[in-house]
Amino acid sequence: LPDSEGKIHLMFLDDVIRYCLPMIFVGMKYTDYEAYTFKFTKDAEMEMDSDLRTGVLQKISKGVKSRKKGEPIRFVYDESMPKDLLKKLTHLLNVDKSDTRVAGGRYHNFKDLMKFPDCGRKDLKYPVWPPLFKSELNGMESLITLIRQKDRSLHYPYHSFDTFIRVLREAAISKEVKSIKMTLYRLAKDSKVVKALIAAARNGKKVTVIIELLARFDEASNINWSKKLQDAGVHVIFGVEGLKIHSKLLHVSTRYGDFACISTGNFHEGNARMYTDYTIMTAHRPIVREVNYVFEFIEKPYTPIVFKELLVSPNDMRKKFITLINKEIKNKEQGKEAYILCKVNHITDKVLIEKLYAASAAGVKVDLVVRGNCSLVTGISGISENIQINGIIDRYLEHSRIFIFANNGEERYYIGSADWMPRNLDNRIEVITPVYDKEIQKDLKRIVEYGLRDTAKGRIVDGSGENRPWQTKEHTLFRSQEELYKSYKI
């Protein structure tokens, strides 16, 4: 709302309606006008049809529709609302006393601020950080050929997701490509990924897509995309009964050798502009072979497969992480170099937390970057005094999972889709891959170390629940996301 002095004033739509009530009810001869907001939340769990004659797609479609009839679980209302109006509303909405009623303020939908209007004030905005193109991957040479030469990596959103789209498009038209297999969890509204897969199928490639229909709140979108893929001749598989497919995988078979992509995040153009995720593209034969094994496991569930390179859940991921941590404990006890560096979204798995406590008690330095839920408590004498945790909330949502183990000077690096949570380790198909390329290892270590050094947007996660900011002078503040962007820009 501009004024005569050239200033711009902002107003909630709620207030526009509130102040314009006389115009809305013109001719009704009311003398007083009052308006109160409320927010009504229903249970989002889906009712799944158990009829064996019903296909998976039909079950999920029916389940999505059942959400409209979900039980009320939360009712937030303007605390100034008159009691008689509140009583009438709760009766009409069938919100009984057992439901959660929360007296709140006048505004309940602050997520709308994610679409904050452009007021022409550049000083109120983040500086523009255009996604970068890696010079090694930005020429005219075949990206598939470049991946065969050595492992390649992309770190979104610092690097452009368009490079990955180029890989898919090249695979779709290349005469040497025989088949493409891919897992899809969440997809953009106008997905270039799906369009490339459809183009590949129309060009005679054998395309198999594993699409997770139970990606929470994206079920309807995934159902729509799966139908389009099927119409184009793509072989679509709807996951494994009882296991959510959360791994981010691409396997491409060619006449001159296969390659694979393993990522920490979704193949989603929108997410790649807001989430920090890491993708490895490799022709390393043992890894590529085992990525194909994962697809075989999904197509033929519960087939016994032994993975030597990959860490795969629910197969053996927790067990292998325990082995890696135990190795650090043993090395420390023998006077060898030992430490653990990790960057994850969440740590809530009791078994792994207790193992990290054991490592700390043995003298192993454990440094973690954890954005979300963290059940690990630092600073307990004799238990966790060797554990440090930094949590970063900045312009990009920290989403990559990186694991580094000292291994007596011969560091072992891993990235993948899993957090250290029971659901990731027990109830999902997740994949973590080792990383052998020295340049990529150096990049991964820089990412974690920058995260640990972040005093501008980082918070000390110590188990108190306060997530205290670092006590650092303004001129010495270190902001990891900004410094990473600068390092990639050089």
Which residues are covered by each model-predicted region?
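Hydrophobic alpha/beta core scaffold segments
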Residues: K365-V369
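N-terminal localization/anchoring segments of enzymes in phospholipid and broader phosphate metabolism
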Residues: L1-I340, A358-A362, C374-Y396, I402-I490
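Glycine/threonine-rich ATP-lid/beta-loop region of ATP-binding domains
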Residues: K350-Y357
